[in-house]
Each structure stands twice: as C-alpha cells, then as structure tokens.
Amino acid sequence: MIFATLEHILTHISFSIISIVIIIHLMNLLVYEIEELRNSLEKGMIATFSSITGFLVTRWISSGHFPLSNLYESLIFLSWSLSIIHIILYIRNYKNDLNAITAPSAIFTQGFATSGLSTEMHQPAILVPALQSQWLMMHVSMMLLSYAALLCGSLLSVALIVITFQKKTDFFLKNKNFYSLRKSFFFGNMEYLNEKGSILKKTSLLSFKNFYKYQLIQHLDSWSYRVISLGFTFLTIGILSGAVWANEAWGSYWNWDPKETWAFITWTIFAIYLHTRKNSKLQDQVTNSAFVASIGFLLIWICYFGINLLGIGFHSYGSFQ
C-alpha cells in the first residue's frame, strides 16, 4: 500500500512538473528568450527525471523485478529515456533543437500512460516463466532506449523535410532579384547595378534568409544523424540480446514473431538511412536520408504500439488486452 501510494505521488509530481516545463518552453520560444526561463526549464526536466527514476526504483522494489513487464511500465521508461537524453545534452552544454522534441515527447508518453490506460494496467504484472530472466532488463531497456533516440532523430528529419520543401526556400539562382544581380556581374555593367541599387539590398536580405535556412538544415541533419546512430546501436544490441534470450526460452534465436519481424524491418530502414546519409555520391543525400528516417518514424510506432493492438505473438504480454 505504501509503495502504491508513493508511485501514485511520484507519477503525478513528474507529470505536473513536465507540464510546467512545456509551458515555460513555449513562453521562452514564442514570447522572448530569457536565460532565467531556460534555466528553469532545465531544472524542471531534472526534477522530472528524478521523479520518474524514483517511480521506477519504487516499482522495482515492490514488484521484485525490473519494471518493464507491461505497457504502462514501458511507457514510463520511455518517458524516462527521453528525459535522460535531454539532461545529458544539457550537462554537456549542447544547445540544440532536441530540446523542442524531448520535453513534449516525454509529456506525451507519460500523459498517455497516466490518463490513456486503464487503472488495471497501472498495477505491476506477475511475470510469466519465460520473462523471469536476467535478459529482461537488457533486452527491453535497450529496445526502449533505441525507440526514444530513433523517435527524436526521426522527428528532426521530419522537421528538415518540412523546411526543405517550403515554397519560399528557392535558392539564389531561382530568384529574380539574384538573376538581375548576376546579370550585372556577368556583363560587367556596373551602371546597371547603380541604377538598381535596391537589388543589392533585397538580394542581401534574401541571401541571409537562405543562408540561415541552409545552416538550419545542416544543423538538423547533423543532430538527426548523431541521435539516429545512437538509437541504431541500441536497437542492434536490443535485437541481439532478444535473440539470445529467445534461444534460452524457446530454443530458437529467431521465430519471425510479429514484433520480431517489425523490429527487423525497422532496423533495415535505419540501416538504409545510415548508408544513404554516408553515401556522398548520391545527390540530395540529406533530403533522401531524411525521407528514409521519416518512414522509420512510422515503423517505430507500428513496432511498439501496433503489435500491442494486435495482441498476438510472443510479445502480446504487453498488449492492451
């Protein structure tokens, strides 16, 4: 009873804090960037991380096993994973676009776990014999950490695609003002440039906007590649550890279970992303790789939630049913 009450308090504290963090982040983003608000945001994420950690430790002690036995616990752990990504970047003094993704993603997952699932699913589940293994912590934690990293990296790629394909992102050579300026240089007609003095001003403004968008695209691509590479590593470890665990439990490394199949498809898609991203011979490789990563975003949700909706296969223990 004491553990249940403590878990209830910790989940509501973490959800309340991260909700305030989101409000502060929106104020800092939409109104005016204030350093004090930014510091409050980071402290709020640390408090949220501490509360979720306290919940996981409490659930671990009360249940006697690592809290990854049902969908509710896995969602809480996913929220914890998103929080730790945010905090690690903050500790290393990285100011990047992941902050705008990790905090909302954490509140979404925790909010769904707290309010979207039935009360019965909040209770710790008794592990079936096949799950009573030390591989539970290794396999499931690696998979959820990979989901968190891959989701963040994929969302950065989606943002990159949106910015790239905006109608107003036509580069210098497609702009009429830049064409006029180019014409003046090509024909050496400096008088034309003097008569059209406003062209230089307009072109400079246009060049600045395009240069800013170019820098933003490169920044998003760089961080997307880093985070997806990390998530791909976790996913590989998770799949391999799951194969070893399956061999111990069922006598076979691979059974083409629905979740195993979709995990393999997800792994293949992100392997294609990494290959496309590293292959400099491909034209527009940034956009191509971002498109592949956006496909991976959908596959992650299918792999994580879709199989739970079906409630079939060896992984149906975490289903909604």
Swiss-Prot record:
The chain crosses the membrane at residues 12-32, 45-62, 71-91, 98-117, 143-163, 227-247, 260-277, 292-312. It holds the Pfam family Cytochrom_C_asm. It is a multi-pass membrane protein. It is found in: Plastid, Chloroplast thylakoid membrane. Keywords: Chloroplast, Cytochrome c-type biogenesis, Membrane, Plastid, Thylakoid, Transmembrane, Transmembrane helix. One of its GO terms (molecular function) is heme binding. InterPro entries: Cyt_c_assembly, Cyt_c_biogenesis_CcsA, Cyt_c_biogenesis_CcsA/CcmC. It comes from the Eukaryota. GO terms for cellular component: chloroplast thylakoid membrane; plasma membrane. One of its GO terms (biological process) is cytochrome complex assembly. Belongs to the CcmF/CycK/Ccl1/NrfE/CcsA family. Required during biogenesis of c-type cytochromes (cytochrome c6 and cytochrome f) at the step of heme attachment. HAMAP family: CytC_CcsA (MF_01391). May interact with Ccs1. This is Cytochrome c biogenesis protein CcsA. It comes from Phalaenopsis aphrodite subsp. formosana (Moth orchid). The gene is ccsA.
